[in-house]
């Protein structure tokens, strides 16, 4: 199991293949991605690499983290993330990870934070159909309706689908295919859409459920 990388979502575009089919692509940029530290089975109970991306002002880093970056002999990073790895896949601290960590035709899993939608109603948040448009219904056309039973149990159960904050959730999209890798511009072109807004950070790692590589 190899390490993943931290990338930045640039936006979307599309291309046409040899059959004239239009393929939607999401562009992600890999820049300044370095190994910050190691987690070992003997010391921490598991094997992992700590990856960092995007340089940060030293004045904005806490003293404990300053020592971490000083030990790694690299500049402070804005984003840090751990990736579990197998024992034979350790990479030297301060080593850089580039776009050629992946190849065209490979399948990857993307973990990102969805776009925040604020407080949303039940129809938008959970795809409820709403109440009737007429036949005695007034004001509450977009209401979720009843949320419980009667005096017993006398409460709304946890997890009940209701209106509330929507978005800003960490989600993983599995088995997305890499269309192409542009080493010169440090871009990875991934087929399909990826959660998150432009310039947001996401993690890219080898697909767990789809090992085969088809070009």
Curated annotation (Swiss-Prot):
Record has Cell inner membrane as a keyword: no
Posttranslational mods: Methylated by PrmB.
GO-annotated cellular components: ribonucleoprotein complex; ribosome
Ranges where the record places region Disordered: 136-155
SUPFAM superfamilies associated with the record: Translation proteins
Disulfide bridge partners, by residue number: none
InterPro entries linked to this entry: Ribosomal_uL3, Ribosomal_uL3_bac/org-type, Ribosomal_uL3_CS, Transl_B-barrel_sf
Keywords tagged on the record: Methylation, Ribonucleoprotein, Ribosomal protein, RNA-binding, rRNA-binding
PROSITE patterns: RIBOSOMAL_L3 (PS00474)
Gene3D superfamilies linked to this entry: 3.30.160.810, Translation factors
Family the UniProt entry places it in: Belongs to the universal ribosomal protein uL3 family.
Complex and partners: Part of the 50S ribosomal subunit. Forms a cluster with proteins L14 and L19.
Alphabetized NCBIfam families for the sequence: L3_bact (TIGR03625)
Function of the protein: One of the primary rRNA binding proteins, it binds directly near the 3'-end of the 23S rRNA, where it nucleates assembly of the 50S subunit.
Designated name of the protein: Large ribosomal subunit protein uL3
Source organism per UniProt: Rickettsia rickettsii (strain Sheila Smith)
């Amino acid at each position: 199991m190899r390490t993943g990388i931290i990338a930045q979502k640039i936006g979307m575009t599309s291309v046409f293949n040899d059959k004239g089919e239009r393929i939607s692509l999401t562009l992600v940029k890999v820049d300044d991605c370095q190994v910050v530290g190691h987690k070992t089975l003997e010391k921490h109970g598991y094997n992992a690499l700590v990856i960092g991306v995007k340089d940060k002002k030293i004045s904005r880093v806490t003293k404990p983290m300053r020592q971490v970056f000083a030990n790694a002999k690299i500049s402070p990073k804005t984003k840090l993330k751990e990736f579990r790895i197998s024992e034979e896949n350790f990479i030297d601290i301060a080593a850089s990870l580039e776009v050629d960590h992946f190849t065209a035709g490979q399948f990857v899993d993307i973990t990102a934070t969805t776009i925040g939608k604020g407080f949303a109603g039940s129809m938008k948040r959970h795809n409820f159909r709403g109440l009737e448009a007429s036949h005695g219904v007034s004001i509450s056309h977009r209401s979720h309706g009843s949320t419980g039973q009667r005096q017993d149990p006398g409460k709304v159960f946890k997890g009940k689908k209701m209106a509330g904050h929507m978005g800003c959730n960490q989600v993983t999209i599995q088995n997305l295919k890499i269309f192409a890798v542009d080493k010169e511009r440090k871009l990875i072109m991934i087929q399909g859409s990826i959660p998150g807004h432009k310039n947001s950070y996401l993690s890219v790692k080898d697909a767990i459920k789809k090992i085969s590589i088809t070009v």
